[in-house]
Structures are given as C-alpha cells and as structure tokens.
C-alpha cells in the first residue's frame, strides 16, 4: 500500500480568499442581484464601464472606474458576476494599454483582485480575451525600470517607485494565477522567459518592498512545480539556486512577520521543486528535506489556531481605534491599505499567517510523499497476452472452485508479503514530533465552519469568512500531510507491529476520529466538507495501519465507517480508505464480534457481486491478511461465514473484474498488475484453507 502522492491538478496555490459557497446566499445573490443597495452601488460602475467611463478622455474618470471595480468585487460574487456580465474583464484588459500609467496600474489591481476572488473561471476568461499580450509587453519595460531604480534610487521620485512596485506586484500576481488555469496558459507564460524577471526581485530583495518580493517568489514556486522549462532555467543558474538557499536558511529576525516567513517558505518550496540539483552546483550536496525544509517548517507548526480564533473574535467584538495617519511611511501603499481600518489590517494579518501555515503544510506534505518510482512494465506486454495467460489458468482455477480434494494444488504456506523495513529511531522521533503538531492543526475550531442556514440569523458568535476559509485550508493540508507521514512509515502488513509506533498511533486515534465526526457533522454549507472528511479518513487509515491489531474497534466507529463507505457520495478512494481502516481494526484478537462484523462487510465486496475494482482488491487482500493464521481466536468467524467457499465461488467474477481494468487509463497498468497478484493470492489462499479441513 503506497502513500498518497502530492496532487497538483486543480490545486491553487492562491486559493480563492473566500469561496462563494461561504458567503451567505452568495451564488443565489449572484444570480439575481436585486437588493437596492447593491444596485445603487453597481450602477455608477456600469455607467463608467460604458463609453464615457473607463473610455473617457478624463484620466481621473478612468482611474476612478478601475479603482471602484477593484474595491467592489472583493468577497462579493453578486457584484463580481454582475460586472462580468458587462464585460468588465475585457474592458479592464484594454485599460492595460492606457497612456496613463496610473490608469493601467489601477486596471492591473482590479484584474489582480478578480483573479484572487474569482478563481479559475475568471482567469480563463482573462486568458481567452488576450491578457497575455499587454502583460508580455510590460515585462521588459518593468525590468529596465527596476534596473534603473536599483542602480540609481534618486532617478525616480518615491511616488513613482511606489507605482512601479505596485504595478509589478499586480502583474506578477496575475501571471501566477494564470499559470494554474490551464496548460495552454502555462505554456504561454513559459514562452516569455519570466524566471529571470522574477529572480531579479529575489536577488535584490533587501532593496525592495516585501510585498513585491513575496509575489515574485510565490509565482516562482508555482512555475517551478512539475514544469520542466522553469525548472531547467533555475537549475542552470548557480546564482538563482544560491539565492533560494540563502532565503530558505536565513535566520528569523526579531521583527519578522508573516510576509518574511512567507517569503522563506516559498523559497524553500521552490528549492524542493527544482531538486535534485545539478552535481556541478555547490548546493548539490545539501539534503534539502532534512537540512532545510524540516528544521525550518517544523517550528512553524506550533502556531495556535485557537489563539488565532480568539484574536479574531476579540478584534471583531472590540475593534481597535484608528492610529494617527502617517503619510511618510515608506511604501505604505503596498498593498493598498489606505482605506482599511486597524481591525481590517489585523484580521488580514491573521489570515495571511494562516495562509503561510497552509503553504508550509503543503511543502511538508511533499517531503512526506517521496516514493520510489514503480518498476517499469515492458512495453511489449499487451492485454491480449495477459488474457491468454489467464485463459490457460482457467482449468486450474475451476478445479479450485469445484474441488475440496486433498490433492488440489497448494503452496506449503499461505500467501506472504514482503515485510517493510523496520523503523529507525530517527523515524520514530520524527513521527512523535509531527503527529501532535499536525493533529492540533487538523482539529476544527469554533470558527472553522460557516454558520448553518438554520443558525446564521440567530447566532451571536462573531463570524469572519476569510478566517473560516483559511482555517479550512489549514485543516485539510494538515490532515493530508499527516496521512502521507503515516502511510509512508515503514511497517509490515502481517506479523506484530512496532510497539513504539503503535503506542503513538493509539494515543492519536481519538483526536483524529473527532476530526472525522466534526467534518461529517459540519453544516452542509461548509465548503470542502467532503475533502476534509476524506483527508481525515486518510489519517485514520494510517493510524490503524501502525496500530494494526492493537486498536480496539468500537461498534459505533465500525458502523460509521461502513455507513460512510456505502453512502452515495463515497467514491472508490473513500471506500478504499474505509476498507483499509476496517481491515486493521479487525485484527485485534480480543474483539471477536467486531471481527465478524467487519469480515461480513469485507466479503460483501466480492459476494454476491463484485464492487468497484480497487476497493474490492483491498478487501480481498485484507481478508487474506486477517485470516492467514488459522490459530487466531477470531478465525472461527471465517469458518462460520463459510469464507473459504465464498472466496472460491468468487474466483470467476474476480477474473472478470481483473480483465475489466483498462491498462490505458492513468494508473491502470499498476492496478492491473496488482489485481492479477491479488487473484493469484486468492486462489492460493482458497487452496490453503481447504487443505486445512477446518
């Protein structure tokens, strides 16, 4: 059983700040925005979008229209979609070529906010409406301006420098959002040689505002993930690699905040993305995971979510008074905060810290997902050949199905599995260090879920949707990270488990189970509720595996796992996780009744009709593991359920199930190979059990 691999598909590095589903009546409101205040707020913008507005000869009018769009769309799907219907995206893109730099800057700001709040659909619309044209033209101009400003700071007034940095930050943010929209958009970005432009900000980070440096390293992190052109560009320049190493290993200063930590986390992630480093580089000898990533990220996991929630609640209940305006503060307009209250600034700081934490967990998940490549399958191996081999075995299989005879072919021993290497002390130490931290971050808080529709109007608890969205992301990332850690931990599928790791797993089980039940019982309006539940199941599977035969199965837990696996919402992966958990719980020799209930359920995956391929194969493998030793106290259950005969009668439908696996689909070759192995194990197991005559 392999550990979960880090998934890239449709996983945004800058997730929507607040999903539409979190906003009360967000989607419904977007479909029919008739509220008077909304109409009154949007009508002037619509007028400005039309000729005489953004297309006005008056620079101030065009600037105002772009700025107003930028302000109105934040966390408001109704206004955003209303403006979309008026082609605001296309109009803003035309404003990128405005002769006024101020108008162009405001347009990039509005497009940036649309990218972050609107998600993939708006990014795709921007790409399809030709945004790459003007963006591509900006890169060399900004590079030249940046070089001039850095070499001679007095060559441009401070206000001009602020505009340049703000403009660059917006452009870079749009590009990183576009890069995650489609392969077509990514290829277009690869073609403009963006990496040197981004690295120029990182190399000169000490002279630049942190926000633009942060945007640059964020974009670099996204582009360097599974993207060979970007990876090769970074690896080919020793200066780039040295810069990333320097940022990742920089000691934390006493005044460092979320921006500084975020920059280091992203640099660390980018460094991992381009590994292994070429041998010619000095940094090639560094073990990035053990020497940089783990020592840096582990302390970040101590952040208290409950403390953050309390700070948010206190800020909402007692917002701090505005501080005296300080117009001389350098780069105060980066990012725009002129009109934000102290409470808004504080809440954004907390949200930003949560996003940094989520990103750290994402990188740590990758550290825990280092699997060796599967053995290559010879290209000349074809389905027809495999099916022919299986046909030649049918006579033998039919004998197994129909015969109890003593001379039936059998192995001397039941099917066995290669034991995984024993865990060393360093691995156990890592496990005992990370499990409590990750469990703490995965446990829902009082603000982790939006209020249900039934309680939204009567609750007195303060709510802050951006915090709720960020907390959900942290919980899911922590669970996925913990799942990878647990499922990658060396252990065997048979025989005794390591007592030290079993003790850790048993202690962690109740809290992980609480997270699962909390996610299942969360309000139906909770965005990513199913994703949270699936991640929690992955953790429980890993814990059950480490404490196989030690964990005592509880009746209500077994019933809930069966209920989840059989629900209409459960896909194959959910069923696999539930089956895996149940299979480990069934191996407690003191819980005979629970063993029987689980065995009945596992047998239902093959009899009377096989279910989906992967969960069925897992169920069969687990049945063999559970009843491999006929001397176990619970073996009486297998006999009373006539397990041997059920498995014998299942060989023909199992053969058909194996043949139905399409090797041409992603993962199909590996699944087909494993299915054939399971089929062979079932045949051997049936023969072995019949030979026992018990």
Where are these regions (language model features)?
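Short inter-helical turns and helix N-cap capping residues of alpha-solenoid HEAT/ARM repeat scaffolds
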Residues: 57-58, 99-100, 143, 164, ...
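Extended, charge-rich low-complexity regions and/or helical-solenoid scaffolds
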Residues: 2-7, 483, 487, 491-655, ...
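Eukaryotic acidic, Ser/Thr-rich intrinsically disordered low-complexity regions
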Residues: 305-313, 317, 342-347, 368-369, ...
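Alpha-helical solenoid repeat architecture
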Residues: 63-77, 91, 105-120, 163-183, ...
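Elongated alpha-helical scaffolds that mediate protein-protein interactions in large eukaryotic proteins
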Residues: 31-44, 51-64, 68, 72-90, ...
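Buried hydrophobic core positions in alpha-solenoid tandem helical repeats
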Residues: 42-51, 88-93, 126, 131-142, ...
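Acidic, serine/threonine- and proline-enriched intrinsically disordered linkers and terminal tails
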Residues: 2-41, 141-164, 292-473
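Fungal eukaryote-biased detector of long internal structured cores
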Residues: 119-121, 127-359, 363-379
